[in-house]
C-alpha cells in the first residue's frame, strides 16, 4: 500500500508542477498613459490604484478635444485648461514649458495641449483663435480666455481667480522658485498669427475641401468677370493709343502749314515785301488818325461852348 502511494505521488508531482507553472500569475496593475488615464475606457484597475501617477499635459488631436469637452458636460472634472499652440511660433515655445509647470502646480485641473497642425482650422476658428499661443480655462458653464503675461506666477494667479483652486502644497516650492523670473515683455505679449503664417502646403493637406472650394469660387468669379475686364482693358488701350495719335496729327498739320508758308514766300518774295510794306503803312495811318482826333477834340468843345453862350 505504501509502495502504491509513493508511486502515485511520484507520478502526480510532475503533473502538479507543470500545471502550476502553466497557470498565469496575477499581473500588477498596468500604468496607463496620460490620455488613457483621463479619456480612455476604464480597465481592471481602479482609479485609486493609479492615484500616485502624475498626469501632466495631455497632447492630443480633435478626438481628444471632443472627449475633453465631453468630460465637462459629464461633470467628471470641474475645470480643464486647454492650450492651442504652434510649433513654428517662438511665443508658443516660450509658453509651453510654463504650461507644463502649471500642470504640476494644479493637479486637480486637467491640462490639454493641441498643436496647430493636429486641429482643423474650422475648429480653431470656432474657438475664436486668431493667434498662437492661446490658453483657455473651461468648465461646464463658461470658457475664460487668458490675456496677460505668460509667466508661471501670472498664469497661477489666473487659475486661482477663475477656478478658486490654490497651488498644491507639494508644488509651492516650484512656484517660489519661479517667482524670481522677470517679465521680459509687456502685459499684452505678442501672438503668432493663425491664418497668414500658415503655408499653402499645410492648408492644402489639412483642409483639402476648403482649398478646393476656395479655388472654385475664385475661378467662377474670374469666369464671370473676365468679359467685363477684357472690354475695359480694350477701351483703356484704345484711349492710350488714340491720344498720342491725335497729338501726332496736330503736330504734323502745323509742320506742314509752316513748310507751305515758307515755300509760298520763296516762290513770291515780292508779295512778301508788299505784305510787309502794307502792314507798316496801316500802322502809320492808324497812329496819324489817332493823333488828329486827340488834337481836334478841345477846339470842337470850345466852339460848342461859345455858341451856347451867345444864344
UniProtKB/Swiss-Prot annotation:
This is 5'-adenylylsulfate reductase-like 3. Glycans are attached at residues 139, 281, 305. It comes from the Eukaryota. Residues 1-22 form the signal peptide. Its main location: membrane. It is found in: Membrane. The chain crosses the membrane at residues 210-230. The gene is APRL3. One of its GO terms (cellular component) is membrane. It holds the Pfam family Thioredoxin.
